[in-house]
From Swiss-Prot:
This is Aspartate carbamoyltransferase catalytic subunit. One of its GO terms (cellular component) is cytosol. Belongs to the aspartate/ornithine carbamoyltransferase superfamily. ATCase family. GO terms for biological process: 'de novo' pyrimidine nucleobase biosynthetic process; 'de novo' UMP biosynthetic process; amino acid metabolic process. GO terms for molecular function: amino acid binding; aspartate carbamoyltransferase activity. Keywords: Pyrimidine biosynthesis, Transferase. L-aspartate binds at K95, R178, R232. Catalyzes the condensation of carbamoyl phosphate and aspartate to form carbamoyl aspartate and inorganic phosphate, the committed step in the de novo pyrimidine nucleotide biosynthesis pathway. The keyword Ribosomal protein does not apply. Heterododecamer (2C3:3R2) of six catalytic PyrB chains organized as two trimers (C3), and six regulatory PyrI chains organized as three dimers (R2). Its EC number is 2.1.3.2. Pathway: Pyrimidine metabolism; UMP biosynthesis via de novo pathway; (S)-dihydroorotate from bicarbonate: step 2/3.
Length: 327
């Protein structure tokens, strides 16, 4: 390929961002590199850009969200988009409208980007098949949460300088976590080594097939790791009793300094939020200004979502047809 041909290649050759699965290391690196530029832009007094001027972004969240929804809203507005937050609680969905009918209705309004979070795995891909615009998965069931994995990767890369060769332990409720799945896929693709640490009741069957090491003991699982990523107990997705009690869970799996001591001396701590202090993480560890990256993750989230919106918008046509489909 000539240099001229390379310049004609799209930054991110995908119409949608439905998951980390299917992305190449080059795709991931391109998004992270672009996000790096937005980190610096967001630290300026004038944060406003214009790459989405004239574009319409719809945020469609079927599940409650603080960080992700506000982050996408801020990202779109900083890029100059017209942003609409659709309230599902007051929409036709509450009157029995199907997801497909919702998709067809929204598509008729000619949006350019739809960001969707849904409680059912696969719902985002279904919607993407019915619309003409670009779709971004903001979390679907226990399936994927791609922008969370990207922001976690950016946070790690900016602090450690790389992803390849790092040992990352993901600890907690792996069974119900879309964050865990997306992070496993991304970290493996970028050459990191991934461990999962959890009681057997909170691990999905066949998790080893994703290329992770499995531990049931925190001391052994954290031995020599570079990054400790804690996950909350997703009680809202639990139909039965997965742990004896939250107090006992913290005793065995909650991250405190005693357990963190098994990791490398310069190991860093992450959490996608929201946190349950005293359940999966001790407050002192969560608030440690030297070792906790939790606040940095929030900052990186806006930059990553700006990068994703920017990258997808470059592939948008100037005129959108009524008939939809995914590519």
């Amino acid at each position: 390929m000539t240099s001229a041909e390379k310049q004609l290649q799209p930054l991110f050759p995908h119409r949608h961002l439905l998951g980390i699965e299917g992305l190449s290391p080059t795709d991931i690196t391109s998004l992270l590199d672009l996000a790096d530029t937005y980190v610096e832009q967001n630290r300026q007094v004038d944060k406003k850009g214009s790459v989405l001027r004239g574009r319409t972004q719809i945020n469609l969240f079927f599940e409650a969200s603080t960080r992700t929804q506000s982050s996408f809203e801020l990202a779109g507005k900083r890029l100059g988009a017209d942003v609409m937050n659709m309230s599902v609680s007051s929409s036709s969905v509450k009157k029995g409208e199907t997801l497909i009918d919702t998709a067809v209705t929204l598509n008729a309004m000619h949006p350019d980007l739809i960001i969707i979070r849904h409680q059912n795995s696969g719902a985002v891909e279904l919607l993407a098949q019915k619309v003409s615009c670009s779709v971004i998965n903001a979390g679907d069931g226990a399936h994927e949460h791609p922008t969370q994995a990207l922001l976690d990767a950016l946070t790690i890369r900016r602090r450690k300088g790389r992803l390849q060769g790092l040992i990352v332990a993901i600890c907690g409720d792996i069974l119900h976590s879309r964050v865990a799945r997306s992070n496993i896929l991304l970290l493996n693709a970028m050459g990191a080594r991934v461990r999962v640490v959890a009681p057997p009741t909170l691990l999905p069957a066949g998790i080893e097939r994703l290329g992770v090491e499995v531990f049931h003991d925190m001391a052994k699982g954290l031995e020599g790791v570079d990054i400790v990523m804690m996950l909350r107990l997703q009680l809202e997705r639990m139909a039965g009793s997965y742990v004896p009690s939250q107090r006992e869970y913290f005793h065995f799996y909650g991250l405190d300094y005693a357990k963190l001591a098994h990791a490398k001396p310069d190991a860093l701590v992450m959490h996608p939020g929201p946190m349950n202090r005293g359940v999966e993480i001790d407050s002192a560890v969560a608030d440690d200004i030297d070792r906790s990256l939790i606040r940095e993750q929030v900052e990186m989230g806006v930059a990553v979502r700006m990068a994703v919106l920017d990258a997808l918008s470059r592939n948008l046509p100037n005129e959108l047809p009524l008939a939809g489909g995914r590519s």
